[in-house]
Amino acid sequence: MKIALICSVFLVCLAYTWADEDVCSLPMNDGLCRALHKRYYYDSATKTCKMFYYGGCAGNANNFETKRACAEKCYKNKALIKTRKRKPKKKKNNKESSEMTIINMD
C-alpha cells in the first residue's frame, strides 16, 4: 500500500514536471472574457517574454503576472539581471562606490 502511494506521488510529480516544461511552448491566449489584466507570455519564436492583456478567464498556462516570472520559467541557460538606476553612494572620502555582480551560468 505504501509503495503504491509513493509511486503515485512520484508519477504525479513527474507528470507535473513534464507538463510544466511545455508551458513556454504554448501560444499566447488572451482568454474569452473582456477584462484587461496586464500579463506576460513567452514567445517561443523570438525567445522573449512579451506583454499582453489577459481577458480573465480561459486562456492557457503561458500566462505570467510579471515579466520576471515568465523569464525565470522559460529562459533557458540565461542570466536574468534586473537593475535599477540609483544615485551612486559617496564614501566619506568622496570616492564613488562601485559594485560588481558575478553570475555563474553553470
Swiss-Prot record:
One of its GO terms (cellular component) is extracellular space. Residues 1-19 form the signal peptide. Residues 24-74 form the BPTI/Kunitz inhibitor domain. GO terms for molecular function: serine-type endopeptidase inhibitor activity; toxin activity. Disulfide bonds join C24-C74, C33-C57, C49-C70. Coiled coil: none annotated. Female salivary gland (at protein level). Its main location: secreted. This is Guianensin.
